[in-house]
Amino acid sequence: MHGLLLAGLAAALPLGVAGLPARQQSGLSPRGIDINPYRFASMAKYSEHKATSQMVHSFSYSKDDDYVATATKLVKSTFPNMTFRTVKDHYIGTNGIGHVHFKQTAHGIDIDNADFNVNIGRDGKVFTFGNSFYEGEMPKTNPLTKRDFADPVKALHGAIKTLKLPVKPQSAKAMPMKEAETFMFEGTSGALSEPMAKLVYIQKDGKLHLTWRVETDVGDNWLLSYVDSKETETVHNVVDYVASADYKVFAWGLNDPTEGQPTMIKDPWNTTGSGSPFTWHGDGEMDYTVTRGNNIAAQDNPSGGGQWENNYRPESPELSFVYEYNEQMEPEQFKDFAITQLFYTTNTFHDLLYSFGFTEEAGNFQMNNNGKGGEGNDFAICNAQDGSGTNNANFATPPDGQNGRMRMYTWTTAQPSRDGDLEAGIVIHEYAHGLSNRLCGGPANSNCLSELEAGGMGEGWGDFYATAIRLKQDDTRETDYTMGEWAANMEGGIREYPYSTNMQTNPYTYADVEGMSEVHGIGTVWATILYDVLWNLIDEHGMSKNIMPKFVNGAPSDGRNLAMKLVLDGMTLMPCNPNFVQARDAIIDADQALTNGQNKCALMKAFSKRGLGSNYKHGKNRVNNFDMPADC
């Protein structure tokens, strides 16, 4: 999660680091760096499928072009006088849609928040696209000619001073890397990895600003700080990545210890599809007898430090991870059980998301991509009972090819203390931050949920997946669910309202976002809308009791899994830093691509109920629209 935490806690997390709450709870306080004053402004535009289909009739195609070439032609025709580069993370999703991402440049230097994403349909034509390209006046001179900007060491000092980062630059020295104007700093302390800097432009207030993008991983935050290239104590914007065998465990679908008892589960990867070809304890080269494999390395981390490889993990030569737990035990007494539970939950979610399309090419978290594309070497590092905090959790999501990092904390809200590793909804929420940060804007760009409304949707997606997965067979659309209630020991959970289709129980509509300035509150609104989407699709298609979906013509046959698939596919279509309206359109477009639009009216019924009706146009102020499309 961008922090599962309660409302004041979340804003402090880093780029990709996500944390939990929304309702205030005694004993909880903000941790880390508050990046809200430094968030990028929203600039993305999105052309949904219907508008794109009408527009591209005049677009020149060649049957000999591949999908990347077609996408490139669209960008060139849209902005013929601009320069850009193709990001090396294009792929074809499981729904047959090709995804290509471009980065705008000026004088060969990236404009870091200027992106163009093109989605190509099965017919080879442009399906949808979005962009945030800068259209203002370009710098007339190449800054690399005069080099009248500060060196990267000064930028590092500026970021540390302005943001009060716990990094000591001491005798920092900038060492050049292979990529132009990119440096790694030696001689620092306080960060979990060596800080980095890269010279980039950003667009802000209608102008381009040359900046040093300073990257610092300080645990609770993994930041990209855009420091002015001349006035190095001026930080323009900040992005945070931290947005965190036999097994005796709480089985998939049990959210927490109040819903059932631990049971024995044998070789669970046999029931979770093709996402783990090496099982959960191998990576194609090594076989492990601990809670480590191709997808996940789960261990304790009582010190809260950045070292993980040699930390304690349960070990069993027979792969029998069977440990005791009862509610009277303190967390350190059931450490083995907690690590095993975390390993089980994250691996199962990995495999489920794989079936929906979060594959190697899409930027998932795996050590060995088995020749299927993507960067690899980036399994998720999952720390149980992490000592760096309490009463929260977070997940850091750097770009594809770098490890995701989850940190699960104990909760001092009850006696004995409770362990977030045992509340599956918290774990799923956190891992979903990795999903959304890798899919939105492409796997090579983890900066695409950095604006306030987009970051709120990142929180909402986490709650949505956590809630969808915990549904029971006898639930109905009248069933309500809370978030974090067990771990926080808080009746009603950590969100302002429970998730409910009842407008009296949860009255949120899109207009409520207008007065919000914190991602968890915004996320609760988004997840509320998606909860209505979920139940509309379940009412249409039913709900399977199986862990993995059954696919018919590429689409899950039941409503719960169809909702999760469409939400995931929507992430791949929408532009970098989307708003609610663009996300709505992307989900509608995802259904068009997957089912030829069979669920359009069920989807729009949910969106319009909560204020995102068919005639809503995103403007300066958020005012509800409850209209339904004429063909519904």
Curated annotation (Swiss-Prot):
EC number(s) stated in the UniProt entry for this protein: 3.4.24.-
Enzyme class: hydrolase
Keyword Secreted tagged: yes
Residue ranges annotated as propeptide in the record: 20-244
CDD domains: M36
Glycosylation: residue positions: 270
Any GO CC annotation of this UniProt entry: extracellular region
Record-given protein name: Extracellular metalloproteinase 2
